[in-house]
């Protein structure tokens, strides 16, 4: 496999390749949940400059983590149809370039958080970075089919980071937001792994549908979706949200549970794909409903 950057790659394509390394679609949801965490942490809308700087700092570190993930997994990515197009897998961008990009982005993000937000948010963001790039990507993902259950903690951190960026402290409310994403992550990724199981089998990664089968995985999707539905009601009990959120999350949970039950009863790859796509919509609308409910109160 080629590992040296291709000199003849046009500038526009190289810039696009660098952009894709940062996984902008995935990170857009990460930054969105962090922003909602900021909005929920303050009685009114957070100060615009602080909001923007904190969002940028968290985004830059997230981009750095994504780039290093692509570098570490370039050999695995090259074996999978879903990821073989990535620049690191194709050899269009060298490891040195990837490390340079990740270092610059990560350092800039941490500098912003340290200099203009607070040290707690900087350290928590750094811990999230290490959790994703080292604990999840290097250690857990190739070692256990429960990788996403344990490693999902890093992906659940953004709303907590947003909260501490505004308040400088950790409280029960952001921990609830953390719990929601933590429980959302396994059914989200397992649905993807189900309909991409042949890809993962080729990669050698011990994903749950490959190691334990579809039926076992779908049962776990249902269990985690049930726990997620319960956790999604906690914001109401804590007074973080009211009637609008309760109605919205009730409908969202019913649909998600419907997908999970359907997977257990009559699995198909098409249904797993729809479940995966809905899970993204679910989390987006859940956090949007939390924000909308706050606007109604204001």
From Swiss-Prot:
Transmembrane domains' residue ranges: 29-49, 51-71, 97-117, 120-140, 148-168, 175-195, 221-241, 243-263, 278-298
Q: Biological process GO annotation list?
A: heme O biosynthetic process
Report membrane topology.
Multi-pass membrane protein
GO CC terms: plasma membrane
* Species this protein is from: Dechloromonas aromatica (strain RCB)
Q: Which UniProt keywords apply?
A: Cell inner membrane, Cell membrane, Heme biosynthesis, Membrane, Transferase, Transmembrane, Transmembrane helix
Highest taxon, organism lineage: Bacteria
Primary localisation category:
membrane
Q: What else is known?
A: Carbon 2 of the heme B porphyrin ring is defined according to the Fischer nomenclature.
The subcellular localization recorded is: Cell inner membrane
- Protein's UniProt name: Protoheme IX farnesyltransferase
- The EC number(s) given in the record are 2.5.1.141
Q: Which Pfam families match?
A: UbiA
Q: Which GO MF terms are attached to this record?
A: protoheme IX farnesyltransferase activity
The record's catalysed reaction(s) read:
heme b + (2E,6E)-farnesyl diphosphate + H2O = Fe(II)-heme o + diphosphate
PANTHER family from the xrefs?
4-HYDROXYBENZOATE SOLANESYLTRANSFERASE (PTHR43448:SF7), PROTOHEME IX FARNESYLTRANSFERASE, MITOCHONDRIAL (PTHR43448)
Record's function text: Converts heme B (protoheme IX) to heme O by substitution of the vinyl group on carbon 2 of heme B porphyrin ring with a hydroxyethyl farnesyl side group.
Q: In which pathway does it act?
A: Porphyrin-containing compound metabolism; heme O biosynthesis; heme O from protoheme: step 1/1
Task: Give the record's family classification.
Answer: Belongs to the UbiA prenyltransferase family. Protoheme IX farnesyltransferase subfamily.
Tell me which NCBIfam families the record gives: cyoE_ctaB (TIGR01473), PRK04375.1-2 (NF003349)
């Amino acid at each position: 496999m080629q590992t040296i950057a291709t000199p003849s790659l046009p500038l526009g394509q190289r810039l696009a390749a660098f952009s894709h390394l940062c996984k902008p679609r995935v990170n857009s949801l990460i930054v969105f949940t962090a922003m909602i965490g900021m909005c929920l942490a303050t009685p009114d809308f957070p100060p615009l400059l602080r909001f923007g700087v904190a969002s940028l700092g968290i985004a830059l570190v997230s981009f750095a983590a994504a780039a290093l993930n692509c570098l570490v997994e370039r050999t695995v990515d090259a074996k999978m149809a879903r990821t073989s197009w990535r620049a690191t897998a194709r050899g269009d961008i060298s490891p040195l370039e990837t490390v340079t990009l990740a270092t610059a982005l990560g350092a800039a993000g941490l500098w912003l958080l340290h200099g203009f937000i607070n040290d707690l948010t900087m350290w928590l963001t750094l811990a999230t970075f290490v959790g994703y790039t080292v604990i999840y990507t290097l250690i857990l993902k190739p070692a256990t089919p429960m990788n996403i259950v344990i490693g999902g903690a890093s992906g659940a951190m953004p709303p907590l980071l947003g909260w501490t960026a505004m308040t400088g402290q950790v409280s029960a409310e952001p921990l609830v937001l953390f719990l929601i994403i933590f429980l959302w992550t396994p059914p989200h990724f397992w649905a993807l792994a189900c309909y991409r199981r042949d890809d993962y089998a080729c990669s050698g990664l011990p994903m749950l549908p490959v190691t334990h089968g579809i039926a076992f995985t779908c049962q776990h999707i249902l269990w985690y979706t049930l726990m997620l539905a319960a956790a999604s009601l906690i914001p109401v009990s804590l007074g973080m949200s009211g009637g609008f959120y309760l109605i919205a999350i009730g409908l969202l949970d019913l649909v998600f549970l419907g997908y999970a039950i359907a997977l257990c009863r009559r699995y198909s790859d098409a249904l797993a794909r729809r479940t995966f796509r809905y899970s993204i919509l679910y989390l987006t609308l859940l956090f949007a409903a939390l924000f909308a409910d706050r606007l109604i109160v204001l």
